[in-house]
Amino acid sequence: MSSQSHLLEKIKIHSFFYNPRDTERVLNIILSGKQIEERKKIEILKAYKRGIDQQYFQSYLLFDNEVKFISKITNFKVKNDTVIARFQNGFIGNFDPHQIADNPEDFYNLITSYMFVKIRKGVNGWYINDIYSIEPQNNYEIAKELFDLANQEHQTYALLLQSFGYDVQKMEIQDIFLYLPRLFPLFKSPITKRQINYVEISNRGTGKTTTFMILQEVFNFRYYTEPPTYANLVYDARNNMYGAVFLSNGLIFDEIQNWKDGFSSKELGAINATLSTGLENCVWTRGAGTESKSSTIQKCIPIIYAGNPYNMTINKLRNPDVEDYLVNYQIFTSAILDRIHIIQLAIKKTYDKIINARVLYPSILKALVDLIQQKINNTNNYVVCDNLESRRQEQSIDIQIILQALDIDLQIGQRSNEELCKQIYNFMRFSNLGD
């Protein structure tokens, strides 16, 4: 058996069929392939439904004095050494942070995971009786085995794509460069310390949403199909609770072609101003009058914008200018576009031609991404592109570092810097809408 076949077989053994319409997929996140009896599965699925479905959850509150649910914390604040949290089902309760962790580092890492929560009805209403994280620890043993196999064959890019359900064996070289950037926001440049921001405008049915769902459910990205409110995104002043940027590892804004129809330019402008500052300086303004003495919080997170192209433009005889084309969406300021590493305007193959839907179990997948990041951190060979200026030049370095860590040979030193930099820029601002 060849090394590549051995790698694919290993991935198959440690993966599951990911279907975003399958309500039972949470079992793979929580159990990571562990086999349990059917009765336990049913109990877990009901607890999960109570944790995400507000009406289903409320129906149990009407009849029981104790309710168990599985959910993530969507907002929280700390007051008098107690965590006050809002969950996906709308329930708000407080708990001692020692219930989920013994130290600050573990608390920080676990606060965004799926929680098992048991609440009881008391004299003064419902209260949290027990709470703890139920996600398994990252499986570095299996991840390292896969990583070493791919590294040996210089196929890290293939391992990454395969791990997210893409079928590299079906892909042509061009396809690899069209789909790989969807996963770049998982990584951080060791040179500029920036994470990768990405815009994709492509046809429907290419697997965008499926990939974004994995980023949401496994890597704790926050997924939006409409513009977020300031309270949801940054800070809820009414309830004095942290917003999405404080509890997520990234933001995904999908279906952006619909945004301008439902929101005023003033509303979009306010959100864009916040996003622009957050993208550049990792500074998110919380506003005055909050309980915290600090008016701003620093956190660096990547952002993905995605949507579908306008039909009137697809059939033009020439490719549109990439950034000019995005003016159609009325949500991108020049400041935001300046902070985007990669923009793709592309007609891509549909998912049936490039996806096998076999995704690594989350405990392995998260460990694999960590290992790839370590490889990125140890990559320091790049060229400075004199054809680019300022921020764009720094972004080109970030992309060179990540591509090389994924075993994409840029042939640095074997061809002219001018040729390489031109290719990198075309990768950063790509369009085939007029092809």
Residue ranges and their predicted role:
Residues 265-297:
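Conserved catalytic/switch belt of AAA+ P-loop NTPases
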Residues 136-219:
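P-loop NTPase catalytic core of nucleic-acid-dependent motor ATPases
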